């Protein structure tokens, strides 16, 4: 699902129109924008390393809520236990913030995501942590989650979205910090989701997992949580086998899920899960997941207004009774409350900066230089 509950929750205050969930998806066309959907987002996360073996994680997300464009960029320096995040918000105007239909071409000021003629995703974002530029080349074809790409969040027709992932991309690029350019390589994950943005009334938040295992397989899981912590019946997932083939849809009943530890934010005071054990017997998977850095919490007062945890994690366990390791990104929303601003407030906030532009702010957590 890739994308932040922040974006979905923003649409709760809009008059939700239901986009088509019957049209056949075609790529690269459907990597572009879908103007009939009130809410849409493009999301990349990944695990990178430099020539010295230092590990990093990144998140770059572009949101479109009707004609309001928001974006988040987060950078995790694992060895320094340093996490930094940035945000942007602008009204959609050429040269300021936009998303093209028919192809991947999304921008929010100088943060951009475009598709090359060869099919690679060209990603650029920057902030106080530094400047990231990546070329992400798909290793596997797009995966359609749910029923032919229709991901249902509840029983109603409006409680659904179109949800597509590329679960493994080869990453090359650079990170420029303090004038020094570091070559990077690694792997990335891409999510694209669009729809009405309506969630069931009993959904308090969600936990989302994107696992990339060293045997070449991937697993996406999301647990939509009620206030009492139980999963709604529309929690689900997808297992992608090592070789290109048919992805296996999963029901939440296929998953054994346990939280193993917790972490409390010193800023928001939210208590987040900080370790998990996940078993999917039908695919022979039994793994533990732990954050690489405890504090990977994003506060977004200048854009979506939602505080959430999204971070790089390590995976270790077994698949088909053989040892397996890997990497993951995990997103945790709703633990710091569901304090979502209305669209009128967001639009006023954007217009208050200039007639066309919104705000761009940043924060850092962990070790500060």
Where in the sequence are the language-model features?
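Bacterial Sec-dependent signal peptides at the C-terminal "C-region" and cleavage site
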Residues: 3, 7-22
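Structured soluble/peripheral alpha/beta segments that form catalytic or ligand/cofactor-binding pockets
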Residues: 17-363, 367
């Amino acid at each position: 699902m890739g994308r932040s509950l922040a974006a979905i929750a923003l649409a709760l205050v809009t008059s939700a129109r239901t986009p088509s969930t019957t049209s056949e998806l075609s790529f690269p066309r459907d990597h572009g924008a879908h103007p009939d959907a009130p809410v849409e987002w493009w999301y990349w996360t990944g695990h990178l390393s430099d020539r010295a073996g230092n590990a990093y994680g990144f998140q770059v997300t572009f949101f479109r809520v009707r004609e309001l464009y928001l974006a988040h960029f987060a950078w995790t320096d694992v060895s320094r236990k340093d996490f930094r995040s940035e945000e942007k918000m602008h009204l959609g105007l050429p040269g300021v913030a936009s998303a093209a239909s028919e192809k991947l071409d999304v921008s929010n000021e100088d943060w951009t995501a475009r598709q090359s003629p060869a099919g690679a995703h060209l990603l650029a974002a920057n902030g106080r942590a530094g400047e990231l530029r990546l070329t992400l080349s798909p290793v596997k074809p797009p995966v359609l989650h749910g029923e032919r790409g229709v991901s249902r969040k509840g029983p109603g027709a409006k409680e659904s979205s179109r949800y597509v992932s590329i679960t493994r991309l080869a990453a090359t690029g650079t990170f420029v910090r303090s004038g020094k350019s570091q070559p990077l390589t690694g792997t990335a994950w891409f999510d694209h989701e669009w729809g009405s943005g309506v969630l069931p009334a009993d959904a308090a938040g969600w936990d989302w997992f994107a696992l990339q295992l060293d045997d070449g397989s991937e697993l996406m899981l999301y647990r939509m949580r009620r206030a009492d912590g139980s999963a709604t019946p529309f929690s689900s997932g997808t297992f992608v086998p090592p070789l290109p083939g048919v992805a296996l849809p999963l029901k939440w009943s296929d998953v054994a899920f346990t939280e193993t530890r917790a972490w409390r934010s010193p800023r928001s005071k939210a208590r987040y899960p900080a370790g998990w054990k996940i078993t999917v017997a039908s695919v022979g998977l039994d793994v533990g997941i732990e954050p690489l850095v405890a504090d990977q919490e994003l506060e977004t007062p200048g854009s979506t207004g939602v505080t959430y945890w999204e971070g790089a994690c390590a995976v270790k366990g077994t698949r088909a009774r053989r040892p397996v390791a890997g990497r993951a990104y995990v997103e945790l929303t709703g633990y710091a409350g569901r304090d979502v601003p209305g669209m009128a407030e967001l639009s006023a906030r954007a217009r208050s900066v200039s007639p066309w532009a919104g705000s761009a702010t940043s924060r850092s957590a962990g070790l500060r230089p």
